[in-house]
Design a protein with these regions (language model features):
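Extracellular receptor-binding modules and their adjoining Ser/Thr/Gly/Asp/Asn-rich linkers
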Residues: 1-210
Length: 210
């Protein structure tokens, strides 16, 4: 495959925030949750990590958790159920007078429920979507996805996240899987470039045992 060839987006992704933005390209890396910041992500250190969330990617067929507006713009409870208030407005109703043979409009009160703006919401402040902020990134959770590798992974075989110890070099990259070691393994479908492969993020292919 040529470097300038277009790749159709596939898979399902959600937006996650980096604990620390990688110095090199942040795309095509296996990621897990950060031990110091549990709600944020970091490149996987080895295939034995308890939780491999997915692979960072530029685009997928469907992206979740990337709202167009600030999600707390309106008051809500702890699980996100928005509070409503009864708002009375006047609406115009068109009627026809059969005796006088003409139409006229009169107003009557109308009750409806509206969301309650949050006291912390500033409508004058422009909201920037997560996908347009460098500290956030798409993570492919299921389906086919492209991941960086050391150039040695083969289609039809399995790969696993690189075990680099404390070194950050190539952390989150794929390497050929050691099938004699218990850990997360992922099926390689094809080689894309010299240092990228396509794999399948599928729960049915995780945690192969020796």
């Amino acid at each position: 495959m040529q470097d300038n060839e277009y790749i159709n987006p596939v898979g399902y992704s959600e937006m996650y925030e980096w604990a620390e933005i990688p110095a090199e390209s942040p795309y095509g890396l296996f990621v897990t949750f950060s031990s110091e910041n549990p709600d944020k992500i970091e490149p996987v250190k080895s295939s034995s990590d308890e939780q491999i969330l997915g692979v960072t990617t530029i685009q997928t067929a469907h992206t979740s958790d990337d709202p167009n507006n600030w999600k707390y713009a309106y008051m809500c409870n702890e699980v996100g159920d928005k509070f409503l208030k009864n708002d009375k407005i006047a609406i115009g109703v068109k009627e026809y007078d059969q005796i006088e043979e003409f139409s006229y409009i009169h107003t009557r009160p109308y009750n409806h429920y509206v969301q309650i703006p949050s006291q912390y919401y500033d409508p004058n402040q422009e909201y920037v979507k997560r996908s347009n902020r460098k500290e956030w990134i798409r993570v492919n959770l299921i389906g086919k996805v492209i991941v960086r590798d050391n150039g040695k992974c083969k289609p039809g075989e399995y790969c696993e996240p690189n075990s680099t110890g404390k070194s950050k070099k190539q952390r989150g990259y794929a390497v050929p899987a050691d099938m004699n070691v218990h850990g997360w393994k992922f099926y390689v479908t094809q080689r894309i470039t010299e240092n990228t492969i396509e794999i399948v993020m599928s729960p049915t292919m995780n945690k192969l045992k020796n």
